[in-house]
Structure formats: structure tokens, C-alpha cells
């Protein structure tokens, strides 16, 4: 399938960012979560940690204090599901109220009024050419900073079992090393090679058609996190399904992450978090102190701290134990990971 779409100029709404609500870390025994649900974790080039929530906007830890940006601070998004940084150091947020750009001083909001496919955003990536690809409830948009262009994918059967009522919803977008674009939908994965778009589904060996996340690891394997049948990966045209015989339990997987050492991490609903070191799958959960069975994202920052986000907020894993991290911390690792 070739690119097809519309072009339109953008005159997005800008709002100066007032001083954010700030909490400074202090010694405390009571943990007040950053938010009841953390959906996305991202570290920008200056070392600030951003935490996208499922209803409270975004929180930012700058190494000294936590800043909160929500509707009260003129940040219109409530659920923040995607965070990226462009080459000009602007931070982009994919939210349930449109695409939001933060330049360090003000927020600029882009919605369907400017040409976005849908205001409910689920994924964003910046490709090798610097273009934003935005996966929404109503399809895919590309954005060059001035103009939105629609990218057409085939309609798929909605996944009503998980509340997906749209034929165009795109859960995730990934660009592989060859430059191909991958899209996760309720009808399997689609891969675009610059000329045509190919569907990859259960008929081809995919473990489940409801794809929540896609990752290419450093070895070139393409991993899929699915909603009903866990994790699988693809080498060439061959799929390998990760199951209980590999030591992995559960079926609902939302996130895939490769750490700097090449380990693959993925949380599975009601089964904690798994790490694959290339040979063995290791589970981390209640035995290590994790107090929730609903982790949705994992991330290692440049200082080596490993973060987990999900229901009940933010957690940090030091290699042996998992602790809750709230508005007042604790933010620093007390022992080497």
C-alpha cells in the first residue's frame, strides 16, 4: 500500500507553561504515588525523567524535585501514552487530548483541527529522517513540524474483547534497522517497506493478532507483545512463541524493552516482569517486593536505575529488590545494580 493522505497547514494552539506543581524529595515513610497508574517512562538528553500517567498528565523528575504538569498547569492531556524527544530537544507527548509539544517554556497542542488523524494517541516514534509517526485511535499521521499527512493502513476487525471499537486503531509503531515501518493493530502487524504494506497475522505464525508492542533487538529479531497470547519473536519468516515451557506465564503483554546490555524485558499481566538474557527467562515479581501485578512499562536510565511503571505507580528495581517510588522518592539507588 502506498502513502495516501491529505495535507493541511497547522496553526496549533500555544499556551505558556506556568510554574509546574512541584514536590521536593524528603525522607518519609509514607509513599505517595506519583499517580495511581504510570503508562510511560522516558529520560531526555538533559537527564530529566518523564513519567506519563493514565489520568494525571505527566510528571518530571529533574534530579532535585518532581514537577507535575496536568490540566491545572495547562497541559491538556490526561492519559500520556507516548513520550519522545526530537533533534531540537523538544519533548513530544502522545495523549488522549492530542499531540503536545514542550519546548521548555510552553506547550503547543495539535489536534484534529490541525489535521491529526484522531486526538486519542497511543504511540509516537521519530524516524531516521526526523518525521513524527503518530498512532491514534483513528489511524496513523505523519508530522514534519508543520504539516500532518495521513498514512493509510487497511481497516481491521475491532477487538471488542478489550474494548477496541475502532477499525483504524494503531497501538504501536516501530522502525527497524532496514528502515521499514511496523504497526501493531487489532488485526495483526503491518510492515511498510516504503512501497507497499504487508499484513502479518496468526495465519503467518504470529502468536496473536492483537499486537500491543513491537521491538527489534540488536540481533535483528522482531518481538511482538500481544494481548491474548503473550510474547513471540520473528527471525526471517519463522516465529517462535514464548510459553510456559520457557518459564513464562500469562498472556496479556503490553511492553517490550531492550536494556543497554541487550536484555529483553517485558511485563505480563498477573505475572510480574520477565528478563531474557539470550538464554534464560527470569521472572521478577512478588518475591522481589513488587506490590502490583499490572506493570505496563520498563526503562533503564543512563545512571543505571531500572524503573517499572504501572498500577500503583512507579517502582525501582536494584537487581535484587523492587521498591515503590513516590513523590518524595526514594530516587537514588543505595547499592550497585
Regions found by a protein language model. Give the residues of each.
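Carboxylate-rich, polar loop motifs that coordinate divalent cations or form catalytic acidic clusters
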Residues: 1-337
